[in-house]
Amino acid sequence: MANLKEIRDRIKSVKNTRKITEAMRLVAAAKVRRAQEQVLRSRPFADRLARILENLQSRMGFEDAASPLMQQRNVETITLVAVTGDRGLCGGYNANIIKRTEQRFAELKGKGFDVKLLLIGTKAIGYFTRRDYPIQATFSGLEQVPTADEANTISTDLLAEFLAESTDRVELIFTKFINLVSCKPVVQTLLPLDPQDIADPEDEIFRLTTKDGLLTVEPGAGPANTEPKIPSDIVFEQTPEQLLNALLPLYLQNQLLRSLQESAASELASRMTAMNNASDNAKELAKTLTLDYNKARQAAITQEILEVAGGAAAVG
């Protein structure tokens, strides 16, 4: 058994580590709330934009859509956009996206497609660069709260590649934020565009509350979608083709921004869960070490008593 000083030093180290993980958990919990609020604030605009595009598309008919961003063409080259974080200590968040990207890459290559990667986040960049994957572009250092400017920079790069026919389809691999303990990697086609409703009935709201004297995040039901439908007889000043060509790039940027926001919320939720588990494990380890320390101390005291008693008997 380790000596008393070693056990005492380890107990101190574990308790200090627990303070760090608990602080990181609280920070992540507060940021999850802000990330969720950002998604909710952007949803009315995204939903209304999608409804307008659906209205325009229904008027034109899919086969009459003149915008090159909606045209289906023979697919030879596919760009996979993988969204990870710049930091670790968030459970399997980054590893799950990397694994899903590798699976999708192998699947498409097996079907004979030319596949290249656009990587967001240093974790994905480092992993795929070391393994010599074909990389189209990389983006890192994004804000913890994704901005429209960042989404615009990435979407502009994707649009240029798609319009130049350097790629025929763009697929986005990101982490969908379902709830605080459930996030899953999903694959979504970005280009060519096919506007759909933004709202998700699985969405939940998370509130920062206190429980047993500790800060925690609890889920609640999301707000009902009360967004009015676009009237079918609405008159647009421009032609549907002109409106589509003007709004589709904005729609692409908004879809990308929403995915970045969901990924950010998922990363924070994963980090909060990971730090909560780490804090619990540190607490249990400290208890075990304290028990070992008490046993070692008792054994040392018993040994000293036996030595003293033995010495006294020898003298007598």
Curated annotation (Swiss-Prot):
Protein name: ATP synthase gamma chain
Similarity comment: family membership: Belongs to the ATPase gamma chain family.
Pfam families, per the entry: ATP-synt
GO molecular function: ATP binding; proton-transporting ATP synthase activity, rotational mechanism
Gene: atpG
Function per UniProt: Produces ATP from ADP in the presence of a proton gradient across the membrane. The gamma chain is believed to be important in regulating ATPase activity and the flow of protons through the CF(0) complex.
Main location (coarse class): membrane
Disulfide bond residue pairs: none
Keywords of the record: ATP synthesis, CF(1), Hydrogen ion transport, Ion transport, Membrane, Thylakoid, Transport
